[in-house]
Amino acid sequence: MKHLLDNNKLSLSNIDKISESKAKYLIEEKGCKIKSIKRIPEGSNHYSFDVILDDGTPLIGKFKKNKNNLRDTLFGGRISLERECVLYSLIRKKTGLPVPKLYGKYKNGGISFILVEKLPGKLWSDYIRENNYSTSCFLKSLEYLGQDIARLQKVTFETFGDLMNEYLVLPKGIINFADRFIGITKMRLKRVKGKNVLDTKKVHLVKKYFFQQISEIREHLYNYKSKPVLVFTDVHSRNYLVNDFGKPSGYFDLESCQSAHPALEFYGLKFFLFNYFNYETFKKAEDSFFAGYKKEGGVYDRGDYINKKLEDLLAINRIMELNESYYGIKDGLRDTWSMKFKELLFEAIEINGVNYSKIADIIRAKDGQPKNPG
């Protein structure tokens, strides 16, 4: 099989062209005989493969993409396979939640990759679809999720930032979440300006809005008033697994975990899950989630003014990020997403609030769920 390396010049310079056959060769070079391998078309930072070994062991193979100093697009932190493995271990140790076990960490021809446990279950979005978008299945699944998030938030830290391991949060020394918010906002605005997504006048308006709004609640965001907690950050319909009853069976997208104000998790749930159907279902979804959350000892006060304001600010900031990240994408599905998120951004700034149903109406094209559940 050496011709795979010779003919395709497999190296860090063209890892972006890695195929199933190349991945198979690299893995087998490390002594793992493969029965089958299939590319998983998800993931922006790694190439992932569904692997079955000759003995029937199911695994997931993750290969680092050829990007020097790979940075997390959401928070700017350093992303690596090593960090991901450390976070798997940390979350399993501290919470007992279902995350992958490491099978092996390798380097071959300058290319880094890992093999991890393939977790059981199906994507949450598939579970909801296979149950005919049942309201009861939807709500029960969110109650289960609430229990897990409560367990996760029992893990606390001293400062805010990118969670690198149990003892290291970067950047060091951020004791007020407002400073973390400002740093992330500056990073995102820099990308917006660099791609000419917004003109100078609009960039100034957006910057002024975020800085003014966060300053109004800054005194409430110190670490001694709201303890930094472990946050997944990006839970959505296609990045965690559930069993046949809707109970989470696997969390695998953990490379961007944060030590953060808990609002960072809750805005995302409103952004991607609670709003999955319509406005009427949103409140029921939120109630079901928090029933599970409280049952497991969760302490976040969703009715608190500061928490609600911070959630909305984080959501509006994410809308800005999506306006930028989808800018210029023409794939037949997301051609108009950037423009639509831009409209939502300035609507949200004008009303100083978020219409989460409109967010769902944009993203709905990907999962194809109806507006009204069964």
Q: Which residue ranges define each predicted feature?
A:
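Short, flexible/disordered intra-domain loops and linkers
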Residues: 10-12, 67-79, 130, 276-284, ...
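An alpha-helical support segment within catalytic cores of ATP-dependent transferases
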Residues: 14-33, 135, 154-233, 243, ...
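ATP-binding pocket architecture of kinase catalytic cores
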Residues: 38-172
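Active-site acidic catalytic loop and adjacent metal/ATP-binding pocket
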Residues: 44-52, 60-61, 112, 212-264, ...
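Short beta-strand segments
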Residues: 62-63, 103-104, 230-233, 251-253, ...
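A general structural signal marking secondary-structure boundaries and capping sites
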Residues: 92-95, 106, 149, 153-160, ...
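Hydrophobic/aromatic-rich alpha-helical bundle segments in the mid-to-C-terminal region
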Residues: 163-164, 323-345
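Active-site activation/catalytic loop segments of kinase-like enzymes and analogous catalytic loops
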Residues: 263-298, 312-333
